[in-house]
Each structure stands twice: as C-alpha cells, then as structure tokens.
A protein has these predicted regions:
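N-terminal leader/targeting and assembly helices and adjacent pre-domain segments
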Residues: 1-175, 180, 298-299, 303-351
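A charged, amphipathic alpha-helical module
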Residues: 157-200, 215-219, 224
Length: 351
C-alpha cells in the first residue's frame, strides 16, 4: 500500500482497493471461460465452479483487505489529530503577530480554560471515533457489495447466454455492464444517492480534518480570550454557494472557541452573529472549502465581503464549471472501468 500523507492519499488507497476487487472478480470470470455457450449442462457446471470461486474470493478479500483497512483507519485518526495540532500552531502565529501590533491580549489563566480544553479533547476523540466507525461500516459494505455483485454476475451471465448473447465474453459483459458503470457504490446517503467507498472517504475525512483544524484554532483563540472570526473571500477561489451569505462577516465563534452565546464581544461590547447559527444555515457543509480566520477588533482589516453583481455572476459560472469538470471526471472513471474490465474485444474498443 502506498504511503498515506493526507486525505487525497486515503481516497486513492480506497480507489485502488475498489479496482483490485473488480479486477480480481473479472480475472476469475476470464479464467473460468465457458466454451459451449448454448449447453445448459455446461452452464450448470460453470455456475457450480464459479460459486466455489466466490467463496475463495470472499475469504481472500477479508484476509487481504482487513489488514489494509486497519492500517488506513489508523492513518485517518493520525491525520485528524495532526489537523488539530496544525490549526493550533497556525493560530498561535496569527495571535503573536497581532500582539506585535499592540493588540492588548493576555493569556487566560489555566484554571479558566482547563475544563474547556478537557471538553475539546473529548470532542476530538469522539470525532475520531465517529469517523473511523463510519469508515469501518463503509469498508464492510464494499466487501459485501463485491460479493453480492459477484454472485449476481454468475447468475445473470447464464440468463444473457440463454437469450442469445453470442459468446461467453459478451454474456459476461452484459452481466457486468451496469455494475461497472456504477462502480462499487456501497454507501447510500439519506437522500438516496449512492457513492463509492473512495468518494465517501474523501468527503468524510476532509470534513473531519477540517473540523479538527478549526478546533485547534479555536482552542488557541480561547487561550488568548479572542472569540471573533471572519469568513474571508477565497482569493481567486470560489466560495461554496451555501457559504456566500456569510463571506465577509465578522462572527462570534461559539463552536470551537467557546465564545459567548449572546454574540457580544467581551472586548468591545459589539454584538455579532454566531458561527453556530451560520453552520445551522449551511456553512461548513460536507466538502466545504471555505474557512474562517481570526478577526482581532482594532487590529484586523475591516471586512470587505460584499459581492458585486458581476462577482456573483462569476461565482455562478465558476461553480457551474466545477460541476461540469466533476461530471467529466466521473464519466472518465466509468468508461475506464468498462474498457478495462470488459472481456469482449469489441466492447473494450467501444468504451
């Protein structure tokens, strides 16, 4: 297994496992080629042999990938802990730089923050446990789906052969076509959408690492008694549509920094909207690429978050372009599977 350094590597590792599961399945189909496609007796014998190979497939996969999944899950926990440490360190740098600009801040006494930090430690461990538990369920699901698809292909191949598929390769390709189009989409979301293990892992780990990073930042702000943050424009980047209403707004971080729930800044008495309310309205949804930074009243540059009509139109076009790109990438993966794992030469060429 390749070295894992970030969520991209984890997604790639899961995608490699998915492709290995499919490749192993197709190799078995190829090695048990049925020569007499119109002989029912021969097909019955073929099914018996293939069902035996399925049991071996299940056993081998559980043994091989069980160890790989365990290693990956340990890396996931490590990445989440590292994300919090990085957020904490970066925030220390931000605040120390602000102090150089005569920011009147003093660290809050240990006693005043000890319980807060204990709570955050528990939150971090709960986040890690929830993420790895969900990944274990998804990992179990991908192996189960591979087994189910294997069995379905065995039975469907004979059905297609009996309806005039022509050759063994064509019969198997007809039986695998829908499966190869979709991939091992073993995870079903609440809205009914199905996703592969690699796609789900990308979303889950990116979301967990982001929350851990924001928690690390928040803990450091709490140490210095700073609770105000701002959702900045993303340079040349494009904010998520759900996050646009919050860009450029100063807020009280009552989620990760433990800011006052009434939204009133202890430093100036100014009342700001709460991060928790923004999250409830869609900020920091899964796969969100936006983030907030510390806003130090009297030191940080006042917000410039209002978008012109032209900027909003550009944002809409960028989002549409990104969606088209993501669709094209999904189509590319689909046809790569069909081309790589089809047995019939004509189908390989077609896809």
């Amino acid at each position: 297994m390749a070295r894992i350094n970030d969520e991209y590597d984890i997604g790639a590792a899961f995608e490699a496992i998915e492709n290995e599961l499919i490749a192993s399945m197709i190799r078995n189909m190829e090695s048990h080629k049925q020569e007499e496609i119109d002989e029912d007796k021969q097909w019955s014998m073929w099914q018996t042999e293939m069902l035996k190979s399925l049991e071996e497939y299940k056993h081998n996969n559980q043994k091989k990938y069980g160890k790989q999944f365990k290693d990956i899950n340990e890396k996931i926990a490590e990445l989440i802990r590292t994300a919090r440490a990085e957020g904490n360190m970066q925030q220390e740098i931000t605040i120390l730089n602000a102090i150089k600009k005569v920011f009147p801040a003093n660290k809050i006494s240990k006693g005043g923050t000890a319980e807060f930090f204990k709570l955050n430690d528990r939150k971090l461990e709960a986040l890690i446990k929830a993420t790895t538990d969900d990944m274990k369920k998804a990992e179990t699901a991908v192996l189960r789906m591979a087994n189910d698809q294997y069995r379905r292909i065995i039975y469907n191949a004979q059905v297609y052969a009996n309806t005039g598929a022509g050759t063994y390769e064509k019969a198997v390709d007809m039986a695998t076509k829908d499966f190869l189009k979709a991939g091992l989409n073993c995870v079903e979301y609440a809205n009914g959408a199905r996703h592969t293990l690699a796609d789900y892992a990308d979303m889950a780990i990116r979301t967990a690492a982001k929350r851990a990073y924001l928690q690390g930042e928040g803990m450091k702000r709490r140490e210095w008694g700073v609770y105000t943050v701002i959702i900045n424009k993303r340079g040349s980047g494009c904010p998520c549509p759900l996050c646009v209403p919050f860009v450029g707004k100063v807020m009280i971080d009552d989620v990760w920094s433990g800011g006052p729930k009434d939204g009133v800044s202890p430093m100036t008495g100014i009342k700001y909207p709460l991060i928790s309310a923004a999250i409830a309205a869609g900020l920091y949804h899964p796969r969100c690429r936006d983030s907030h930074t510390t806003y130090i009243e009297g030191v940080s540059t006042p917000p410039d978050g209002k978008y012109t009509r032209e900027e909003l139109n550009n944002l809409a076009e960028k989002n549409a372009r990104r969606e088209r790109q993501q669709y094209a990438e999904r189509q590319e993966k689909k046809y790569n599977r069909l081309s790589q794992f089809s047995l019939d030469p004509e189908n390989q060429k077609k896809y």
